[in-house]
Amino acid sequence: MLPMSVHPATTPALASRPRVSLPRPSTPSSSSSLVHLKSRRPPLRSLRSLTAAAAAAAVEAGEPYFGLGDDEPLGGEGDAEAVVESEEYKVEVPEKQDPMLVLKFIWMEKNIGIALDQMVPGVGSIPLSPYYFWPRKDAWEELRAKLEEKEWISQKQMIILLNQATDIINLWQQGGGSLST
């Protein structure tokens, strides 16, 4: 006999207790507990149909019915259509906004930097070009070359963006680099 083993004959306290054991399923306990948990909880569809049935019964009996989150009684004053309307859910989807091409600029005392970005609603700004600096290099020509590389930019958009870049460069030249004038 090993010193760590316990036998009912040698320990009277253990021998006098009856042992009750529950039958164990043949499947692993983790999967059976998951199935058991799932079977306890009715699906949401069942809850909605139970709520609708309780509301309809309250309307027929003329009793006030307070559903989940409702502030006003539906029974007595309303009809069965009110119950059906409360079950309808409406989802409003905002209008799809198209991405926009924008010019960003850095206004400095001796330089002005111009870059092309794409603004995507809900996402933010996506840079399409690095900053091109004037008068260090010809920023307008570099921007035009970058716009021509992007085949998906229309000719009209390209002209508008280049005109805006011209206006910004001219404004910077007139002000001498300072924004206070």
From Swiss-Prot:
- Which InterPro entries does the record match to this protein? PSRP-3/Ycf65_sf, Ribosomal_PSRP3/Ycf65
Q: Where is this region: Disordered?
A: 1-40
Q: Does the keyword Electron transport apply?
A: no
Signal peptide boundaries: none
Its cellular-component GO annotations read:
chloroplast; ribonucleoprotein complex; ribosome
Coarse class of the primary localization is plastid
Q: Domain of life, per the record?
A: Eukaryota
User: Mind listing the UniProt keywords for this protein, alphabetically?
Assistant: Chloroplast, Plastid, Ribonucleoprotein, Ribosomal protein, Transit peptide
Cellular localization per UniProt: Plastid, Chloroplast
> What is one process in the GO biological process aspect for this record?
translation
Gene Ontology molecular function: any one: structural constituent of ribosome
Which spans does this entry mark as compositional bias, Low complexity?
14-36
Task of the protein? Component of the chloroplast ribosome (chloro-ribosome), a dedicated translation machinery responsible for the synthesis of chloroplast genome-encoded proteins, including proteins of the transcription and translation machinery and components of the photosynthetic apparatus.
So what family is this one in?
Belongs to the chloroplast-specific ribosomal protein cS23 family.
Subunit note: Part of the 30S ribosomal subunit.
Q: What is this protein called?
A: Small ribosomal subunit protein cS23
Tell me the name of the encoding gene.
Answer: PSRP3
